[in-house]
Design a protein with these regions (language model features):
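Flavin-dependent oxidoreductase catalytic cores
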Residues: 1-123
C-alpha cells in the first residue's frame, strides 16, 4: 500500500546514507490483505519509484524471467540490474538462451570459456 511504500522509500534513503550501494526491491507477505498485482515485471514500477525517490540503484527479481522484459526494465530505467532467480534454477543456461533471444553476437560466451569455445565452433 502507499503508506508502506513511502516508509520503504524512507528506509531506503537511510540505508543509502549508511553506505548501501544497491537495493533489492521485493514484496513482502506480512500484510494479509495486500493486493499484489502479480504479473510479468510487476515490480518494475515500484522499483523505479524507489530508485527515483531514494536516489539509489535498484534491482528486483520478481517477474523478470523473460529476457526481453529484463532488458526493457534496465533500458527504461526501472532497474539498474535484474536479479534472475527462478529462471536460473529452472535453466542453469538461462544467460546463454537470453543472449541468443536478444540477438547478442557470440552469445555462447555467456558460458564458461571451454563451453563457449565448443559451442561456437561446433554448432
Amino acid at each position: 500500500d502507499e503508506q508502506t511504500l513511502a516508509e520503504s522509500i524512507e528506509l531506503a534513503r537511510r540505508f543509502k546514507a549508511g553506505g548501501l550501494d544497491l537495493l533489492s526491491v521485493s514484496v513482502g507477505f506480512s500484510t494479509p490483505d495486500a493486493n499484489i498485482p502479480w504479473g510479468p515485471a510487476f515490480m518494475g514500477p515500484v522499483a523505479e519509484r524507489v530508485r527515483r525517490e531514494a536516489d539509489i540503484p535498484v534491482t528486483s527479481a520478481w517477474g523478470f524471467g523473460e529476457p526481453k522484459l529484463a532488458e526493457e526494465a534496465v533500458k527504461s530505467g526501472q532497474l539498474d540490474l535484474v536479479s534472475i532467480g527462478r529462471a536460473h534454477l529452472a535453466d542453469p543456461h538461462w544467460a546463454y538462451f537470453a543472449a541468443k533471444e536478444l540477438g547478442v553476437e557470440k552469445s555462447a560466451w555467456t558460458l564458461p570459456a571451454p563451453y563457449a569455445h565448443w559451442l561456437e565452433r561446433y554448432r
